[in-house]
């Protein structure tokens, strides 16, 4: 196992889910914090970052024009300080059926302007609502990524249901902190089962700050390399943004 770990390269991570963009949701409150978070991520090995501010009635409903303006400010500053870090724009969509009513507006919330959308649900969402959401998104011509799938009561209680979502066509994202056990034993147990069967498509930080929910992925990467191999670790933590969302 030591030989496998030595083959791993502990840099080049891609973070497709975080709240680093300042002033638009419950994540970074200002440009200074956003820059600190980017530096922290860079020093930890992240090289591509898709910023995904909330589209959520309680956590952030900033207008698209404001998000783009703040993104351009941050990306410009980041390019000067961290020229080899890619900064892209997406959105984390709190799923309600109304979000599919206007496909032009949905395009504004897609990952890097692609046909892929990152969707989240209430922690107590029922299985059927998630299933219907995945199918509805696919029917509109978009590809769903289910955000932090391990945070929903229905999925932690019924792991087989996550496999079903995958079979329906959804990609599965889990948070790095859940892999390393920071969100409790039952959550980690669920995630370990998914990783063992290679059900997980993306690991992301879901970072909100520089203290408790940080944009650091290297600890998780090291764990996955040790338990599940470097090839799978690279596939789910070093995604090519242009290839995935181009």
Regions found by a protein language model. Name each.
Residues 1-84:
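An N-terminally biased module of ancient metal coordination in phosphate/nucleic-acid-related enzymes
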Residues 3, 217-246:
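Mid-to-C-terminal alpha-helical segments outside catalytic/metal-binding sites
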Residues 14-16, 50-52, 88-91, 145-147, ...:
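Active-site neighborhood of phospho(di)ester-bond hydrolases with catalytic His/Asp-centered motifs
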Residues 33-37, 67-74, 133, 161-165, ...:
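A general structural detector for well-ordered alpha-helical segments in enzyme core domains, enriched
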Residues 42, 138, 195-196:
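Non-catalytic positions within long, well-ordered alpha-helices that form the structural scaffold/packing
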Residues 55-59, 94-96, 151-155, 179-182, ...:
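Active-site environment of divalent metal-dependent phosphoester hydrolases
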Residues 61-173:
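Extended substrate/RNA-proximal surfaces in nucleic-acid metabolism proteins
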Residues 199-215:
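Short acidic/histidine-rich active-site segments
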């Amino acid at each position: 196992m030591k030989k496998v770990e030595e083959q791993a390269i502990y840099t080049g991570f891609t973070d497709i889910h975080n709240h680093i963009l300042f002033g638009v949701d419950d994540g970074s409150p200002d440009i200074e914090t956003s820059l600190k978070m980017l530096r922290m991520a860079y020093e930890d090995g992240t090289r591509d970052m898709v910023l995904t501010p909330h589209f959520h009635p309680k956590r952030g409903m900033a207008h698209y024009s404001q998000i783009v303006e703040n993104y351009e400010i941050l990306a410009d500053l980041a390019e000067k300080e961290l020229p080899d870090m890619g900064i892209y724009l997406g959105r984390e969509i709190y799923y309600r059926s109304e979000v599919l009513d206007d496909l032009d507006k949905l395009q504004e919330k897609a990952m890097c302007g692609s046909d892929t959308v990152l969707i989240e649900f209430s922690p107590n969402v029922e299985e059927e609502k998630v299933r219907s959401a995945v199918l509805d998104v696919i029917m509109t011509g978009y590809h769903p990524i289910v955000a932090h799938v391990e945070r929903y009561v229905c999925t932690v209680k019924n792991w087989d249901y996550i496999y079903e979502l995958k079979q329906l066509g959804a990609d599965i994202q889990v948070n790095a902190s859940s892999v390393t056990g920071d969100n409790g034993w039952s959550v980690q147990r669920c995630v370990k089962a998914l990783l063992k069967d290679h059900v997980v498509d993306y690991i992301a930080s879901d970072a909100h700050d520089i203290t408790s929910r940080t944009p650091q992925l290297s600890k998780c990467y090291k764990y996955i390399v040790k338990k599940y191999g470097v090839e799978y670790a690279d596939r789910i933590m070093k995604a090519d943004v242009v290839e995935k969302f181009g």
